[in-house]
Amino acid sequence: LWHNFWLDRDNVSLQTVQNPRYVFEEFAARPRPAAAPAAPADELPPFDAFDLDPAVLAAQSNEILTAVIQGARKEETSPEVQLAALRALLNSLEFVRLNFEREGERNFIMQVVCEATQSPHVAVKVAAFENLVRIMQLYYDKMRFYMEQALFGLTVLGMRDPEPHVALQAVEFWSTVCDEEIELSLEAAEALEFNEEPTHVSYHFAQIALPEIAPVLMELLTVQDEDSDEDEWDTSKAAGTCLGLLAQVVGDHIVALAVPFIEGNVKSPDWRRRDAALMCFGSIMDGPESKLLTTLVTQALPTVLETLHDPSPAVKDTTAWTLGRM
């Protein structure tokens, strides 16, 4: 267990925090079974075997965070060490709430993670975006400054990344934003019902970013593999889910962006684009007000019914799903 590595096993104590690189070099250099030889950083699996023990984190969060952040910095020359540090950070985020309350420490953590999203090593980039997803989930109320300064741009770039694992995590970031803002909206409605002030405030990140992120999500719907497993989670499925959550947050505002995409692709010669158009239409059903939605469905129904006879099995499946949502 990782906590045994941190605490005195093999004569390693918490004084090792003074030399954090040593710890992560040890992780990166640990022998692997013959069936699993050492892999390049871009192919390294998650460091599940090194999950941090919650009890250790609660007691030693400052010292461990210092070591982790030092190893995760862009100045680190070993991608394996940086990846191990980012994995450790991901596991420790829940336990460093006091550090996130302090602006200087929070700024440094966010700087290190944001810089890691620009790493030339895919596994490091993926781990950095995984951290951003978790940070948004845990510390939404602290993210306004960072969204304005960096996260809007970084995550849009991430969604456009040609490496699907990077794009997937960038999409998950916005799904998390939407999840948080849906919860905040429900909380605000409940507070209003009792004539109270809500405990937390929404910064409406999704609404602000809508013109930038919605078109990217719609294009990601076209990135399907005809032979992919139906149950396999991929960028296209993640984009559809995110688009649905986005529609719930922004309501009618999604329509002006979705309709041109749907109309421009539903009769495309490329089955992927036809499928994406139908997926887009089905995904936004929970967003607009019922009156506007009724108008949309009435106008679109004849075209959607035509696609039940599409030569592509994938398109026919998506048509059936969309009709079930209408």
PLM features per residue range, with description:
Residues 1-6, 16-28, 43-49, 85-96, ...:
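Hydrophobic residues within the alpha-helices of tandem HEAT/HEAT-like
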Residues 124-126, 153-154, 159-160, 172, ...:
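Long, polar/charge-rich, low-hydrophobicity segments
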